[in-house]
Amino acid sequence: MSIDPASATAVPHDSPQVGGDRLDRPVLLVAGVVVLGGIMSILDITVVSVALETFQREFDATSAQVAWTMTGYTLALASVIPLTGWAADRFGTKRLYLLAVLLFTLGSMLCAAASSLEMLVGFRVLQGLGGGMLMPLGMTILTRAAGPSRVGRVMAVLGIPMLLGPIFGPILGGALIDSASWHWIFLINLPIGIIALAYAWKVLPGDRVEPSETFDWLGMLLLSPGLAAFLYGISSIPDAKQSEGTIWTLQVVAPAVAGALLIAAFVPWALSGRNRHPLIDLRLFQSRTLTVAVIAMALFAIAFFGASLLFPLYFQQVRGEDALGAGLILAPQGIGAMLTMPVAGVLADRIGPGKIVLTGIAVITAGMAMFTQLTADTSYAFILGALFVMGLGMGATMMPIMSSALGTLEPHTIARGSTLMNIVQQVAASVGTAVFAVLLTNGILDIAADPTTDPVGYVAGLADSFATVFLVATVMVGLVLVPAYLLPRRRPAAPVDPTAMVGH
């Protein structure tokens, strides 16, 4: 019988908490550093997505070729995330965070100076190596600084870039490209990166390192290329479906199967008694709370990131909006999330994340269900209202799930736990994007195959295809209610190790 770390280390609710219940100035300063890093890495993904057409014109390339500016970044992200937990314990989170910001900022500067598509892809990989470390490191730093009793509130702070980046990124990207040039979608990272470096150097405390811990070389050789290959195969599915009419192409199957086999081979090695320090500690799944949180995060990420693909496409392909207009229409979703996120963080710390996540998922499901009624001329008032409702739910979902997982861990396992959660989120997001893109492509191909369809009928059929895919998204979000019901419904009370952030 396994023992949840939360139960093993629980203390009475009236026990003194490290740092008190309020987010004091040192924690808020640390949170500011982490938010800056998160804004850079997450905004960059969505800002670049609106520049793909510009890259095609600038470099005289095909859509498949310029897609490598996104794919290269994603593969670098997948390769470096598994190493982050070990590197944080080995070298310290402050040193590694500074390195991550430096790599990302340097990569941004080089991307802006790229004179060919090949150079741009290479520099995007450098960006991805830095960006892949920023979010798991941010979770580790904030959780250690605040302690379990305040993890909900600090996760709400970290959720600002995670939830708002996909919404406001297209707005920023469209504005920069229209008013200046594509170079500025990268140059805008330079002042943020320089400020983040100086800020992190000043306010991040030194932390304990484990110089005696050995590196899991075999684990790295199995997991990092395994994740990269699997995600490459999955991300190739939409293109294969559109160009070949099937997902069972060599471009999809070969990397996806090879990656899955490498990941599967990593599991017994990680659990082996000979492996004292696995790259990703799968023994963390002995915690029931973490296991449930991982399942909830996977289901939610599939639905959320998959649906995030649909919104701008509907506005552009059905309603004729440009990239900037589509981004502006999505703003109510961000406003709703901003309203509930800080409240959800406080309540998660007071009454446990379980009730908060249940409420959030129910609200998102209601908002998503409204999109199953989409037509080619659905009123914008209805759409904006549905987006606002979804935003209210999102602010009460993603970060409470994260806090429920990390709040049960001992200080020395937080880095590995945050790395695990980020891997799950990255894989699930890629799967969700691919699945929803294929479902939408199927609908579009069916409409295009009908020779009797006139332009008006095509647009109406296209809107129906979006509504059908939103029905799948609604069901997927609703399924999150099952693991959410099993999340903790009482205040986390595990003490944080006061030496966890002592400088050396």
Predicted ranges, named:
Residues 26-83, 119-120, 181, 218, ...:
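Transmembrane core module of solute transporters
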Residues 37, 157-161, 215-218, 296, ...:
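Hydrophobic alpha-helical segments of secondary membrane carriers
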Residues 44, 73-80, 130, 161-165, ...:
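MFS transmembrane alpha-helix packing/gate-lining sites
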Residues 55-56, 87-88, 172-180, 234, ...:
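Interfacial helix-cap and linker-helix signal at transmembrane-aqueous boundaries
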Residues 81-223, 236, 377, 411:
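Helix-loop-helix hairpins in multi-pass membrane proteins, especially solute transporters
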